[in-house]
């Protein structure tokens, strides 16, 4: 009873903080000058991280098993993983661009998990026989950590593509404008050229930083995903007598692995780095959500215990 009450309190606290942080983020999108307001939202995510940690520990103690047995618990753990990846660059200060892009992922995932949409599966239940194994922690935690890291790295790649596209478009417009105005501005030409060069240099540095960190985060996520798939195969052999069954979840996890293996392969070719590899990662972003949510909508296969409630099927 005590743990249930504590879990209820932590859930409402985290949802309240997330609601406030979402509001702050929307305001900062409109007003960039409010630095203190943005910093408050960052601290709010950190507080949410500790609330989620407390929620997971409380649920673990009350249920007697690691909280990764259904969709709700996996969403909470995914939100926790996003928050963990978010706060590391936040404290490093020199990679704040990561926290700005990753932060909203933690916010919206936690907001969805603690909202009333998944109320039916908030209550902890006894594990089904297939999940009563020590492999639960190893397999599912590695998969969720892998999904979180891959999603974050893919978001960085999406941001890279957006900036690259805008950069190329504005370069075209500005170059034409410069050619037209240079005949009339006279002494202002050098000043305009310097401003254009400085802005272009900043964007180039930003693109390089996004490309660098996207590669590092995706590499980490790919490692987690590989460990998760291999441990899942061993667990499947113990539970069902076969390492691989081409279950919908297994199939899409394999497709996800292939897509990001292609991404890492493109990184070995210097000519394919940057926008080309970012396109592959962006495709992987969609594939992960299909694997994580889309397959759950079907509610079939050996992983059907992680599906949506019956009202959503």
Swiss-Prot record:
Keywords: Chloroplast, Cytochrome c-type biogenesis, Membrane, Plastid, Thylakoid, Transmembrane, Transmembrane helix. It holds the Pfam family Cytochrom_C_asm. GO terms for biological process: cytochrome complex assembly. The keyword Transcription does not apply. GO terms for cellular component: chloroplast thylakoid membrane; plasma membrane. The chain crosses the membrane at residues 9-29, 44-64, 71-91, 101-121, 143-163, 217-237, 244-264, 278-298. It is a multi-pass membrane protein. It is found in: Plastid, Chloroplast thylakoid membrane. The keyword Plastid applies. InterPro entries: Cyt_c_assembly (IPR002541), Cyt_c_biogenesis_CcsA (IPR017562), Cyt_c_biogenesis_CcsA/CcmC (IPR045062). GO terms for molecular function: heme binding. It comes from the Eukaryota. PANTHER family: CYTOCHROME B_B6 PROTEIN-RELATED, HEME EXPORTER PROTEIN C. Required during biogenesis of c-type cytochromes (cytochrome c6 and cytochrome f) at the step of heme attachment. Belongs to the CcmF/CycK/Ccl1/NrfE/CcsA family. HAMAP family: CytC_CcsA (MF_01391). May interact with Ccs1. This is Cytochrome c biogenesis protein CcsA. It comes from Nicotiana tomentosiformis (Tobacco). The gene is ccsA.
């Amino acid at each position: 009873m005590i743990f249930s009450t504590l879990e209820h309190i932590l859930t409402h606290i985290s949802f309240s903080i997330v609601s406030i942080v979402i509001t702050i983020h929307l305001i900062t999108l409109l007003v960039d000058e409010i630095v203190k307001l943005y910093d408050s939202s960052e601290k709010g995510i950190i507080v949410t991280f500790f609330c989620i940690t407390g929620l997971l520990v409380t649920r673990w103690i009350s249920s007697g098993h690691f909280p990764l047995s259904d969709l709700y618990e996996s969403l909470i753990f995914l939100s926790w993983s996003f928050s963990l990846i978010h706060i590391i660059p936040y404290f490093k200060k020199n990679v704040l661009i990561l926290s700005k892009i990753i932060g909203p992922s933690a916010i919206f995932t936690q907001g969805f998990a603690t909202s009333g949409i998944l109320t039916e599966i908030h209550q902890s239940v006894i594990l089904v026989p297939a999940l009563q194994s020590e492999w639960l922690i190893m397999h599912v935690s590695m998969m969720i950590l892998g999904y979180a890291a891959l999603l974050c790295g893919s978001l960085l790649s999406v941001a890279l593509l957006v900036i690259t596209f805008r950069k190329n478009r504005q370069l075209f417009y500005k170059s034409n404008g410069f050619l037209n105005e240079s005949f009339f501005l006279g002494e202002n030409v050098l000043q305009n050229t310097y401003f254009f060069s400085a802005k272009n240099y900043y964007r180039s540095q930003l693109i390089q930083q996004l490309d660098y960190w996207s590669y590092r985060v995706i590499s980490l996520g790919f490692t987690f995903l590989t460990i998760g798939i291999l441990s899942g195969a061993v667990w499947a052999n113990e539970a069902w007598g076969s390492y691989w069954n081409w279950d919908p979840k297994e199939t899409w996890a394999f497709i996800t692995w292939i897509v990001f293996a292609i991404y890492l392969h493109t990184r070995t070719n210097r000519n394919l780095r940057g926008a080309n590899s970012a396109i592959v990662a962006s495709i992987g972003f969609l594939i992960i959500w299909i694997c994580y949510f889309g397959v759950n909508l079907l509610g079939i296969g050996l992983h059907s215990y992680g599906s949506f409630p019956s009202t959503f099927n």
